[in-house]
Amino acid sequence: TTSLNQTIYMRMLIDLKGAGETATTTLYGIFSNKAVVISNIPISIATAVSSAIIPGISAAYARRDETGARRQVGNAIRITSIIAIPSAVGLAVLARPITMLMFPQMESLELASSLLSLLAVTVIFYSISTITNAALQSIGRMNLPLISAGIALVVQTVVLVALLRFTDLDVRALVLVSILYSVMIFAVNQYYLRRFLGIRQDVRRDYLQPLVCAALMGAAAKAVYYLVSMAAEPMRNLPKGFYFRNIVATAAALLAAVLVYGYTMVRSGTIRRKDLLSMPKGQLLVRLMEKLHW
């Protein structure tokens, strides 16, 4: 969708609305080279961690063990949501600090971080859709992910043209259709999994509970960032002090986020020992949890 959306965006703003080519290209560059690049990082991590579970799906389905295949798919989706949901919340609440950390150009910081905070939600849907695509392919339904993508592409293209033609959303229209595209692929894939594999997910356990824990995590991370930034205020007087202060505050906020999310997930029973063991380095995570007496 990237090249198609870029073409539509550039042509409609320049040819139809008379926007300057330099300004339009700059705005698109901030979106694609900053906000999208950052949002893709947790998607890659979530996919890498969860894809370790996928080979078992093919093996179970080859043995005609549909119950085992359903269990494997459900576990993969659950682990992905456990990783993707806090990643999305973290990007949303720490969008400005993270953008400053990776792309410290002050002239584009506000726009890039605001786009990232909106785009963060796609982390959840793209991460899970990557797993469901692989699951559908594992059960021999190779064409279904293409159908999902095709349906989503048509709808998001129509919506993008309408938004650019009839609103002044400008580059934010690209964010909105990116969200729409990710949600549609997620929804259509979920339908296919229910139809062809009989999967019924526990929405409360797989999505709502991690979301509540992630919300608490986000509040803690935001508070820690603010407090550490205030404490490190004297660093502003140093050369590039604002940047180093941001590094310190962001690192503290991320550490707080990991601790709060891990603690609330374990204490609430949202994540279980067997969930941790199904992840790469799961034994290490279990030992760490035991040492912390969680």
Predicted regions and their residues:
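Alpha-helical transmembrane segments of multi-pass membrane transporters/permeases
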Residues: 132-161, 172, 179
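Interfacial segments at transmembrane-helix termini and the short loops linking adjacent helices
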Residues: 74, 92-123, 236-241
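Alpha-helical transmembrane segments of polytopic membrane transporters and translocases
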Residues: 23-46, 78-82
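C-terminal transmembrane helix end/exit motif
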Residues: 6, 179-230, 259-275
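Short alpha-helical transmembrane segments in multi-pass integral membrane proteins
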Residues: 72-102, 170-196, 211
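Membrane-proximal transmembrane or re-entrant/amphipathic helices at the cytosolic face
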Residues: 225-294
